[in-house]
């Protein structure tokens, strides 16, 4: 796979292992911290898992993706910070980022500005047992699915030739991005089943009254 946008001569300040280790540690702390705090709220296991997901995805959208969107000179900085180097590393799997391709810029922009805050609103809604938490989860999950599908589809329509090697293509582009198809799909399906059950129960009660 050719990679016309990849700055091949760029040297990272952090090694790939160090980047993944620190990034993995930060994600682990978010998940474990959310799990621990949610346990103090006497939430069911399913709700606690959802809280972990929504806290994690919300912070990723706002911090990591927001940094990419609002830092136009990210790939020109000669002394990039940790988040910038994460994007430089991820660019090995999808070089559209270094060129600030309009498709990824639009998708990441919506994720940072809209889906990130809404994901954190879901956290609040679950903790406070708000009635709108389910419909909000469904809506944000569908939006994430839509964004992920656009992300893959736009790459496919342009030749799907943006990775520096097959390894980075499957590990970064496919592997990491697929999370926003798998998890939102599971949440949306679960909500759909619950809504069907509620509607069926309502129809049965209505039939008895008639």
From Swiss-Prot:
Bilayer-crossing residues are 17-37, 50-70, 107-127, 135-155, 172-192
Q: Does the keyword Lipid biosynthesis apply?
A: yes
> Has keyword Transmembrane helix?
yes
> What keywords is this UniProt entry annotated with?
Isomerase, Lipid biosynthesis, Lipid metabolism, Membrane, Steroid biosynthesis, Steroid metabolism, Sterol biosynthesis, Sterol metabolism, Transmembrane, Transmembrane helix
Q: What EC number(s) is this enzyme filed under?
A: 5.3.3.-
Q: Per its record, what are the GO molecular function terms?
A: C-8 sterol isomerase activity; cholestenol delta-isomerase activity; steroid Delta-isomerase activity
EXPERA domain residues = 46-188
Q: Which domain of life is it from?
A: Eukaryota
Query: GO cellular component terms?
Result: endoplasmic reticulum; membrane
- So what does this thing catalyse? 7,8-epoxymelianol = isomeliandiol
Subcellular location(s) of the protein: Membrane
Its placement in the membrane is given as:
Multi-pass membrane protein
Q: In which pathway does it act?
A: Secondary metabolite biosynthesis; terpenoid biosynthesis
Any single biological process term in GO: sterol biosynthetic process
Q: What is its main location?
A: membrane
What does this protein do, in the record's words? Isomerase involved in the biosynthesis of limonoids and quassinoids triterpene natural products such as ailanthone, chaparrinone, glaucarubinone and amarolide, allelopathic degraded triterpene lactones inhibiting the growth of other plants, and possessing antimalarial, antifeedant, insecticidal, anti-inflammatory and anticancer activities. Catalyzes the conversion of 7,8-epoxymelianol to isomeliandiol via skeletal rearrangements.
Which family would the database say this protein is a member of?
Belongs to the EBP family.
Cross-referenced PANTHER family, in alphabetical order?
A: 3-BETA-HYDROXYSTEROID-DELTA(8),DELTA(7)-ISOMERASE, STEROL ISOMERASE
Report the protein name in the record. Isomeliandiol synthase ISM1
UniProt organism field: Ailanthus altissima (Tree-of-heaven)
